[in-house]
Swiss-Prot record:
The gene is rhlB. This is ATP-dependent RNA helicase RhlB. It comes from Citrobacter koseri (strain ATCC BAA-895 / CDC 4225-83 / SGSC4696). It comes from the Bacteria. It is found in: Cytoplasm. ATP binds at A53, Q54, T55, G56, T57, G58, K59, T60. Its EC number is 3.6.4.13. Keywords: ATP-binding, Cytoplasm, Helicase, Hydrolase, Nucleotide-binding, RNA-binding.
Amino acid sequence: MSKTHLTEQKFSDFALHPKVIEALENKGFHNCTPIQALALPLTLAGRDVAGQAQTGTGKTMAFLTSSFHYLLSHPAIDDRKVNQPRALIMAPTRELAVQIHADAEPLAQTTGLKLGLAYGGDGYDKQLKVLESGVDILIGTTGRLIDYAKQNHINLGAIQVVVLDEADRMYDLGFIKDIRWLFRRMPPANQRLNMLFSATLSYRVRELAFEQMNNAEYVEVEPEQKTGHRIKEELFYPSNEEKMRLLQTLIEEEWPDRAIVFANTKHRCEDIWGHLAADGHRVGLLTGDVAQKKRLRILDEFTRGDLDILVATDVAARGLHIPAVTHVFNYDLPDDCEDYVHRIGRTGRAGASGHSISLACEEYALNLPAIEAYIGHSIPVSKYNPEALMTNLPKPLRLTRSRPGNGPRRTGAPRNRRRSG
């Protein structure tokens, strides 16, 4: 983490359990991010927290540190059974659940607390085998958690810590009934530590906090600057006919180390993938149609740097901790203005700088006023020279369902292109 992203507050300044301090120091975490510095004094005092912070500011480590400390500092109930986890962390997507689990593993290795993972799509028996051996902290998506609970593979009667991550996304995806179903099977709110984190805290999320938490304290980091100080935003107005060529020209001009291209539909994403793969880029595709194992593999390849570009719908826009994304391209302006914030929040993370480039085409330019009103500023407009756009581009590849994650390796030096004005 960059020093500019950290506070003077050190984890060792808090009365954290020694094993938690050891795990953090082993990972090189010494100073807190702003959200951690605000949340930890409250959770260590046993207070519930509803936290709002920009994506990439350390929300995950804030609730993981709090959860591990609480479980190490408070004994489990005397008659706790093997199918009763002590902490439940709920996430809106499988990818986010997997990421939280990965972030929690170093803490688990040092503290000895056992982790479980529960998400739909695949791995039912493998996940169940881990649960049957007993876990302290269960991380998962609501559908699979309810499935296991209804079959009595898990029992929530011994829960001491609850975390809701990306709570507003839970609403967007229609999971609120599932969340309430799970809460009804836990001890009362005043008998557990409750944490809720999200990049936005809407009225409906605050209502959920009021329902399911015990007088939660609200903490916010830079709420007035929704898009982040370190993200350079840029907007182009292409015609529909020039839109794809402009994207390809910008990618050649910027030559990003690691970029995400967002579009509003899976079919548009597949089309973009085909053009970029045919042009020699190492590009992956992430949509709801991609099988779960392939989605995780593609994310892993992108994180490792084996892929340079990820083309995605908003399934990948929330909560995923993909390091060192240098550029975000909004091929389509999103219909939901909150998604604009979450999309461009993929870059400029943990104190790094980032670049967001949006294309306001004839189809989606109508979304721009609402986006700019929501973020509180106008996005700077850049012009381009249509005559400088790339030409003679190869015919786009058609997606083959057996290999949606791989394009050719991009080779050669970037082709220099210049914008006008």
